[in-house]
Amino acid sequence: MKCDYFERGDCLSCRNIQLPMVEQVSVKQQQLIDLFRGISVKQWLAPILSAESGFRNKAKMVVLGAAHKPILGLVNPKGEPVSLCDCSLYPKDMQLLLHRLERFVQQAGIPPYRVDKSKGELKFILLTRSQSSGQFMLRFVLRSDQAIVRIERELPQLLQEFPEITLVSANIQPIHMAILEGEREIFLTETTRLEEQLNNVPLFIRPKSFFQTNPEVAAQLYQIAREWVTEFKPNYIWDLFCGVGGFGLHCADSNIRLTGIEIESEAIECAILSATKLGFTQVDFSALDSTHFAKGQSAQDKPDLIIVNPPRRGLGKSLCDSLSEFAPKAIVYSSCNPHTLMSDLEYITGYQITKVQMFDMFPHTDHFEVLVMLEQL
C-alpha cells in the first residue's frame, strides 16, 4: 500500500506497508509455523485477514507545534513535528475529525506540552471510534486542569459540527514525562462510555479500558472462539484477563455459568453492563489479578473450560501451573505475543494442541494475534 508518510521517512510504524497484504500474511504465518516446529498441532487453520486501510478504531496523537499552529501526530526521526491526520489506517470520518481537532486546539488557544521544557498544557489527544455506530470518544490529556475552561468554551461548536462525538473527557497527567495518561479523568459530557457491537454482542469502552484496535478482525476472533467453545458444551467457563468481556460474553448463554477476571475496574464495569444488557444472570465479573484469583480457587468448583487472553508478557509459570492443576476439558488461549505463548505452552501440562489460527490484527507490522485450542489428553 502506498503511504506518503512512510515514503518520506516521517512515520515508520508500519514497517511492512510496502509489501502486498498477501505477502505480509504469508510471512507472519510462516513465522508462527516456525515457532511451533517440533510441537504437535492437529490442525492449522487458514489465517484471518484484515482490511488494508481504514481498519483502526483508535488514534493516539501527540500534540505538537504551538497554540496558534498545533499539530496532531508525532516527531519524525529528524526531530520535526508531523501531522498524522491523514494516516490511511483511520477511517475517513476519523481523519476529518482529527483535522477539525487541530483547528479546535488552535481556537481554544491551548499550548501543546513541551517535554524538553516542561511547559505547556495539552499532551495528547486520544480518539476512539465505535465501528457499529460511528460514534466517538474524545479525550484530552492535560498537564493540569487549567485548560479545561478553554475546552468547555469551544466544545459546544465542535459537538454541533460532529454530533457523533458522544463522550468527551479530560485526563490529567501532571508528571513531566511522555506518559500517555494519568489517574484522574474528568468527564465533560453526560455519557461516560462508548458502545460497540460485535456479532450482536454489546460491548462498552470506558476511557481507560482496553479494546482491540481492529474491530473487524476482533469480531472474527470472538466468533471463532465462540465456535470452538460451543463444541465442548461447557457448563462453567472462566474468562481470565477478560477485559470488557469480549470472549466470555460471546461464549456464554443463559445456561452457562461464566466468571470473568480482569484487573482493570473500568473494564469490569463495562463487562457487567454488557452481561446485564444480554440478560445473562449466571455471570460474575470481578476486578482481580488473574493469577491470584486462580491460586485462591477450590478444586471442587472448577470450570469445564478456561479462556485466557493475557497481555504481551503472557501467563507466567504460576498461572500455567494453576491451569494444569484445574485440568479443564479445554483451554482457549488468545495471544498477541507468540513468543510468550510458546513459553506458556511449555508449562501447561496434560494437553494437546488441536487448533491454531493466526489473525492479522495489526496489518503492515510484524505483530499478529493467534488463537490456540488445547484439549485434555
From Swiss-Prot:
The active site is at C336 (nucleophile). GO terms for biological process: rRNA base methylation. It catalyses: uridine(747) in 23S rRNA + S-adenosyl-L-methionine = 5-methyluridine(747) in 23S rRNA + S-adenosyl-L-homocysteine + H(+). SUPFAM superfamilies: S-adenosyl-L-methionine-dependent methyltransferases. PROSITE patterns: SAM_MT_RNA_M5U, TRMA_1, TRMA_2. It comes from the Bacteria. [4Fe-4S] cluster binds at C3, C11, C14, C87. Signal peptide: none annotated. S-adenosyl-L-methionine binds at Q212, F241, E262, N309. One of its GO terms (molecular function) is iron ion binding. Its EC number is 2.1.1.189. Pfam families: tRNA_U5-meth_tr (PF05958). Keywords: 4Fe-4S, Iron, Iron-sulfur, Metal-binding, Methyltransferase, rRNA processing, S-adenosyl-L-methionine, Transferase. Catalyzes the formation of 5-methyl-uridine at position 747 (m5U747) in 23S rRNA. Belongs to the class I-like SAM-binding methyltransferase superfamily. RNA M5U methyltransferase family. RlmC subfamily. This is 23S rRNA (uracil(747)-C(5))-methyltransferase RlmC. It comes from Shewanella frigidimarina (strain NCIMB 400).
